[in-house]
């Protein structure tokens, strides 16, 4: 109720029912929630894929779970062709719509990619934002595969 400046639960639910307002809720405040950066998520994925984050069995389990991502409308949408494996995880809270993934083209080294966004609205489905996440991932992975990007 504090986040919506409401005095009753009914007032809070009424305020949150409007997707025209992007509330500044405590869930968006890094001091009160788990928070990370796209760079750190890419480092974590690189450590996982190289076997430096977990035990061998833990690594295989984590990779298998990420390969079974059930939402194909974000990063996966940037790679609609066969011969490409995308293992990822979405993260959505209100206006925050993120996804991290490892994209692997057959015969090539895997590429970690993280796309973090903040939408203007908190609608549960925002196809244009999801498609943009896929497009940004495609552009980033294409550049990394070209060998022209220097860290």
Feature roles, as predicted:
Residues 1-25, 35-42:
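Active-site-adjacent helix/loop patches that line small-molecule binding or acyl-intermediate pockets
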Residues 26, 30-151:
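Structured C-terminal helix/loop/strand segments within mature extracytoplasmic catalytic/sensor domains
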